[in-house]
């Protein structure tokens, strides 16, 4: 992460919010936080005015790296940043196609593919 260069998430003592989370969140909360940040930046990439696709993708990579480190430090899994990015990209791609089902939207994903993504997500959460 770009600690020290982006002080907009620091308190008056120079402590970063992410470091606070590491000390005050339990493992599941921190893993959830990192996962949501990866997804947020993947979905947003290239859409926010003034922010490049690459900048948001790199933010997603930073959080994926944090999640991989957290998981590996706790000796729960051997996920790499690429593993996490692949998993998160599947969810982001599914989200891009998702509409409220009351609108009779037909996903480009088959029911089997959606089930496989759901199962992969559940396995990922259990392992992380």
UniProtKB/Swiss-Prot annotation:
It comes from the Viruses. Keywords: Early protein. Belongs to the skunalikevirus SaV protein family. Involved in the sensitivity of the virus to the host AbiV system. This is SaV protein.
């Amino acid at each position: 992460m770009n600690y020290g260069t982006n002080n907009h998430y620091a308190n008056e003592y120079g402590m970063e919010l992410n470091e606070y989370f590491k000390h005050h969140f339990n493992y599941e909360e921190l893993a959830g936080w990192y996962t949501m940040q990866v997804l947020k930046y993947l979905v947003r990439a290239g859409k926010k005015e003034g922010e490049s696709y690459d900048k948001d993708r790199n933010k997603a990579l930073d959080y994926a790296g944090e999640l991989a480190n957290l998981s590996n430090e706790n000796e729960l899994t051997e996920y790499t940043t690429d593993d996490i990015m692949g998993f998160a990209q599947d969810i982001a791609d599914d989200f891009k196609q998702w509409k409220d089902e009351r609108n009779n939207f037909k996903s480009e994903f088959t029911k089997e593919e959606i089930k496989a993504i759901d199962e992969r997500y559940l396995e990922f959460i259990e392992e992380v």
